[in-house]
UniProtKB/Swiss-Prot annotation:
Residues annotated as binding GTP: 38-44, 62, 88, 143-144, 146-147, 173-175
Organism annotation: Homo sapiens
Activity regulation remarks: Regulated by guanine nucleotide exchange factors (GEFs) including RPGR which promote the exchange of bound GDP for free GTP. Regulated by GTPase activating proteins (GAPs) which increase the GTP hydrolysis activity. Inhibited by GDP dissociation inhibitors (GDIs).
Homology family: Belongs to the small GTPase superfamily. Rab family.
N-acetylthreonine modifications at: 2
Keyword vocabulary terms for this entry: Acetylation, Cell projection, Cytoplasmic vesicle, GTP-binding, Hydrolase, Lipoprotein, Magnesium, Metal-binding, Methylation, Nucleotide-binding, Prenylation, Protein transport, Transport
Binding-site residues, Mg(2+): 43, 62, 85
Protein name: Ras-related protein Rab-37
PANTHER family attached to this UniProt entry: PTHR47978
Compartment(s): Cytoplasmic vesicle; Cell projection, Cilium
Amino acid sequence: MTGTPGAVATRDGEAPERSPPCSPSYDLTGKVMLLGDTGVGKTCFLIQFKDGAFLSGTFIATVGIDFRNKVVTVDGVRVKLQIWDTAGQERFRSVTHAYYRDAQALLLLYDITNKSSFDNIRAWLTEIHEYAQRDVVIMLLGNKADMSSERVIRSEDGETLAREYGVPFLETSAKTGMNVELAFLAIAKELKYRAGHQADEPSFQIRDYVESQKKRSSCCSFM
């Protein structure tokens, strides 16, 4: 016996009822790219956020492009973050450029124990301004903050550079999870606000939000 696709079979000649379509498990989608020199911890950063785990041991560089999805809820809105992990090596840079145009947000990482990765941030920002959307969300992240004994880049240096380019700044640790979730939640809140805020909804500034959360975290650490 054949029937209408998507219909529910009934008895006694009753008209079949269509099954309700499956509702998506998210309300909006945002494409986020992780950028920065090879070895700054982009892959570990992504896995810490996605799975709450840290990849220790042998370092394996990302080849080309990889991505993972995760849905986060901000202010009652489910935001699906499609997070692209990019290779930092120069030979893959042309591949990375092709993905800039569709990105709504970019997380730019450097390693606080590696001066060259910090010095190269300006070059990365030049590429971003050349290839990415004009209104793309950018956040600067000083990763490997758990390795304080090997630090060569002061937190103040990261703050100063971020202010120069008008972007929010966080120090993070893919190993301990420090500020990893905050970085993605801040991005999700910004994307949600841009997608269509209500007239009576207060304006959202991602830099102000990040700063307020940093101060809140600092206060809690002394309690």
